[in-house]
């Protein structure tokens, strides 16, 4: 289909103001990298997401979902087809010991809402820079806690635009993985069941975790967060440190000297710089320790034309 025809048909199913054409994506990612999206849509209702996904399915148009871009690298060639930003689905509702949140809400804000209502169980998320949708997608966790510990259910959409409600068990939450990834679903909403707690104790725990995070992580630079999954029996950051790779730089991206598990954009780095550095670190760690590192960060999009 011609680009103008797709635009016309999209305008017929969702409000025109949520549609952008050839939208630069670098401003939506923590790494500050990325090319353009053919169509960038920011739905404000679940029904919008369903309509867009169903349209894309019936017209064989690829769909990519974005949260707040904290654990993703988008290549400079951009993303073909439709990109759906879920950030406008950011509601947070608290009732008794339960919180229901839209996919686009920051998990940090959900953690704070729990604290404000004297609910414990989400303290671990007080420093995770991701959206609820992304947190469920990868079973986000930190400091001994993870989404799996407290999520009740997630409302999802499949690739046909159909609604599916999945319980904690049905989500198949594992280390940085879930059925959402495996079946290419998208999370619209998640519900968490928490426990009553002492608000001062909850705040003290969050303060402690925040202090630990700020002292160890290179928050002063753009980054994609933790780059690699934890290999069985090892810590990725320790392996990278022992391989003397801290400070190693490709283009404008380097392995953080503050925390070896992070790669930071120190000087106008590109997605290609990130990808090349990831591959280099994997190669060296494999050679030195015979351990294979698997990226935790998602790398998506097209390579720029000059690299094809």
Swiss-Prot record:
Disulfide bonds: none annotated. Its EC number is 1.3.1.98. One of its GO terms (molecular function) is FAD binding. It is found in: Cytoplasm. Pfam families: FAD_binding_4, MurB_C. This is UDP-N-acetylenolpyruvoylglucosamine reductase. SUPFAM superfamilies: FAD-binding/transporter-associated domain-like (SSF56176), Uridine diphospho-N-Acetylenolpyruvylglucosamine reductase, MurB, C-terminal domain (SSF56194). The active site is at residues 176, 226, 296. HAMAP family: MurB. It comes from Staphylococcus saprophyticus subsp. saprophyticus (strain ATCC 15305 / DSM 20229 / NCIMB 8711 / NCTC 7292 / S-41). Residues 32-197 form the FAD-binding PCMH-type domain. It catalyses: UDP-N-acetyl-alpha-D-muramate + NADP(+) = UDP-N-acetyl-3-O-(1-carboxyvinyl)-alpha-D-glucosamine + NADPH + H(+).
